[in-house]
Amino acid sequence: MGEREIVFGRVRFVFRSSDITRENVDAIVNAANSHLKHGGGVAGAIVRAGGYEIQAESDEYVAKHGPVPPGGVAVTGAGKLPAKFVIHTVGPIGDSPSSDEVLRNCLLNIFETAKQLSIKSIALPLVGTGIFGYPLERFVNVVKEFIKEYFTNYVGPLETVIFCDIDPSKIKKLREALEQIIQS
C-alpha cells in the first residue's frame, strides 16, 4: 500500500496502511485494556505475532503495579517482533465526554516514555478507533492539536512517527488533517 509523509518540526510523520506488528521501529504502541489482557484487535495481533512473552510481561506488570489507568502506559519487551519495545496504552472507550482527554494523556505518556527510552522511531495504531469504538473524527482532531502543541518546539531523540492501520481510508483522513498543520 502507498505511504505518505509530512515533516513537522524535527520529526517525520509517516502514514501507512499496514500491519503494525511488521513495522521495523524501536517501539510499537498497543491499544490495550487496563488489565493488559491482549485478546482482540491490535493487542491480540501483537501477542500472536510477538509471542506469549509479551502477555507474560504484561501480566507481571499488572501484578506488580496494578491496572493501567485510562491514558496511562506500560512498557514491555517486543518478543519476536522487529521492535525493541511495546508501549501499551489504555485509550478512550466509546464516545464519552472524557474520551478526548484520555487520548491526549495517552499521546503525552507515549511520547514522554519514548523520550525516556531514547526511541528514534515509533509506530502507533489509531488508538481507540477500532474495537473500543472511539470516533475517528474525534481521534483525528485530538491528534492534530496534540502534534501541533507537542512537536512545535520538540527536542528529543524521536525522528520518525508512523501512524498505521489496516484501513487505508482511516489513515488518509488522519494524514489530510495533519497536512493542514503544515499549510497553516
Q: Can you say where each PLM-predicted feature lies in the sequence?
A:
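Glycine-/small-residue-enriched capping loops at alpha/beta junctions
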Residues: 1-116
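Phosphate/ribose-phosphate-bearing ligand recognition and processing surfaces
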Residues: 93-184
